[in-house]
Amino acid sequence: MSRVAKSPITIPTGVEVTITSNLMSVKGRFGQLNMSIHPCIVITNTNNKLSFDITITEKKEQKKAWAQAGTARANTANLIQGVTEGWEKKLTLIGVGYRAKVMERVLNLTLGFSHPINYKLPEGITVEAPSQTEIIIKGMDKQKVGQVAAEIRAYHPPEPYKGKGVCYIDEQVVRKEAKKK
């Protein structure tokens, strides 16, 4: 049995969870998120606690079903946090002349190329640039926030010799020593 799926999720006040046969909808102060439910998983809501169980009785298939239940439980917890608090990722630009500027729904990046990069933001994502070298990405959907952060970082990932590039704020760049003559 999955240790993750065993622990129930307490639904905070102000969050409404609706479960149908194959779809879960979570509504909170930031909006609404939906998630599909695997057919072998049963989710029950008793006294504002969500518990997860499986419908499979065959011993061979139970391990996979419990893995699915654990994943569903983790994703549900992410949905609940997304509609109550939201998710955020912070990026920093390291390098001479590296700058970020937000203009409406477009993030303008100057990363040492001969041209500026204009990144169009997807729906449900907001970006702030408190300084020219910091980017804060916010949104309800954890996957979408992480995807946008990864796409922005991919324009110029940190290089190991000088450490220049776009880094996550808590990322440790492994530095290499320059070639000796």
Swiss-Prot record:
UniProt-listed PROSITE patterns: RIBOSOMAL_L6_1
Lineage: superkingdom: Bacteria
Task: Say yes or no: keyword Manganese present.
Answer: no
Q: Name one GO cellular component term.
A: cytosolic large ribosomal subunit
Instruction: Kindly state which keywords UniProt assigns to this record, in alphabetical order.
Output: Ribonucleoprotein, Ribosomal protein, RNA-binding, rRNA-binding
The record's Gene Ontology biological-process terms are: cytoplasmic translation
Its Gene Ontology molecular function terms? rRNA binding; structural constituent of ribosome
Q: Which residues form a coiled coil?
A: none
Q: Which InterPro entries match?
A: Ribosomal_uL6-like, Ribosomal_uL6-like_a/b-dom_sf, Ribosomal_uL6_a/b-dom, Ribosomal_uL6_bac-type, Ribosomal_uL6_CS
One family from Pfam that matches here is Ribosomal_L6
- Secretion signal span: none
Q: Which PANTHER family match?
A: 60S/50S RIBOSOMAL PROTEIN L6/L9, LARGE RIBOSOMAL SUBUNIT PROTEIN UL6M
> What is known about what this protein does?
This protein binds to the 23S rRNA, and is important in its secondary structure. It is located near the subunit interface in the base of the L7/L12 stalk, and near the tRNA binding site of the peptidyltransferase center.
Q: Which family does it belong to?
A: Belongs to the universal ribosomal protein uL6 family.
State the oligomer form and interacting partners. Part of the 50S ribosomal subunit.
Q: What is this protein called?
A: Large ribosomal subunit protein uL6
Record organism: Ruthia magnifica subsp. Calyptogena magnifica
